[in-house]
Amino acid sequence: MEPAFWHKRWADNQIGFHQLQVNPYLQAHWPALGLAVGAQVLVPLCGKSLDLLWLAAQGYRVLGVELSRRAVEDFFVEHGLVAEVSRRGAFEVWRCGEIELWCGDIFALNAEDVAGCTGLYDRAALIALPPRMRERYMALLDDLPAIGKGLLVTLDYDQSLIDGPPFSVGDGEVRAGFSGWQVDEVEGREILDESPKFLKAGVERLLERAYSVRR
């Protein structure tokens, strides 16, 4: 999954993964994590998600990481926010109030960059990555010791019937990748009837799961 793939998706406005409302799992299950108000939350591969605004509105500081500059720029423009832009290492950092979006490759992050992040929210990062990149991504999260609590959303389906993204990430893979964490499935829902692309491909089950992760 090369960066050019995602740059083209954004350039062509092929962003079906972008949700037009705040994620219901986030609203339902984030409060139960008990993350202190004022804490900083890492949101990998954040796009221009409305979830960023929701987290900030709950009193959290938000650090999103996004490869596409188009997505970052669109986020601020579409919400009438004026960002200060600076550089930090390999990243272009856009900041307005309690929201920072770091434009660059997620794998260029290190523990020092996100030392202030104690929370994690991943709705569309893990499922955006093919298997080997998922391994790298989960290893990266494991190497960010400040992060202690988070919410993760996945999809589980027969990958042989249709190519990702979004990719299928089964329960076993989540628990293996987060082996040093306490992993609890907090909600699971069958969403095949809402997903014409998967129905057309002959997929018979499309399970969306939300997990809390803690360590």
Located regions from the model:
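Conserved S-adenosyl-L-methionine
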Residues: 57-61
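Class I (Rossmann-like) S-adenosyl-L-methionine-dependent methyltransferase catalytic domain
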Residues: 1-37, 48-52, 64-99, 103-113, ...
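Class I SAM-dependent methyltransferase "Motif I" SAM/SAH-binding loop
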Residues: 42-47, 55, 125
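A short SAM/SAH-binding and catalytic strip from SAM-dependent methyltransferases
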Residues: 106-109, 118-133
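Extended hydrophobic secondary-structure segments that form protein cores and membrane-embedded regions
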Residues: 41-44, 101-103, 120
